[in-house]
C-alpha cells in the first residue's frame, strides 16, 4: 500500500494517529509522515522486525533520528539475500507523489541475525 493510500484509509476511518511498521524497513516513514501532516494525522515511526527466532515484533521510535538509527541497524543485520521480484514482488519506496525513490536490494521478509532480546535492547537504547 502506498503512502497516499495509507493516509486516505486512515482519514476515511477517522484515525488521528497511525504507526508505519513495514517489514524490516523504516524507509517509507518520512513520506508517510509528510502526507499525514497535510491531513492532520499524527504518525509514529517503527518497523515489524523478524528476529532470528522468527518472532515478528513491532518496534516504535519517536523521532526521525531514531528512525534512521533503526534503519541502519536493520540494514546491518538483515541477510543480504537478493530479492526476486518475480517471486516476492518489488520492494519499492516512493515519494509523496508516488514516484519511485528506490528499491530495497535485499529480501525484506528475511529474519535478521539478532534475537528478540538483542532487538529489544537496541530499540530501548536509542
Give names to the regions the model predicted.
Residues 31-126:
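Extended substrate/RNA-proximal surfaces in nucleic-acid metabolism proteins
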Amino acid at each position: 500500500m502506498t503512502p497516499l493510500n495509507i493516509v486516505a484509509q486512515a482519514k476515511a476511518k477517522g484515525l488521528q494517529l497511525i504507526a508505519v511498521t513495514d517489514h524490516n524497513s523504516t524507509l517509507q516513514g518520512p513520506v508517510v509522515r509528510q502526507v499525514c501532516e497535510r491531513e492532520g494525522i499524527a504518525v509514529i515511526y517503527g518497523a515489524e522486525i523478524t528476529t532470528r527466532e522468527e518472532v515478528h515484533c513491532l518496534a516504535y521510535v519517536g523521532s526521525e533520528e531514531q528512525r534512521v538509527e533503526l534503519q541502519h541497524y536493520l540494514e546491518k543485520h538483515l541477510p543480504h539475500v537478493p530479492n526476486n521480484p518475480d517471486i516476492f514482488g518489488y520492494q519499492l519506496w516512493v515519494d509523496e507523489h508516488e514516484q519511485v525513490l528506490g528499491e530495497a536490494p535485499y529480501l525484506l521478509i528475511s529474519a535478521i541475525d539478532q534475537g528478540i532480546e538483542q532487538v529489544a535492547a537496541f530499540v530501548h537504547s536509542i
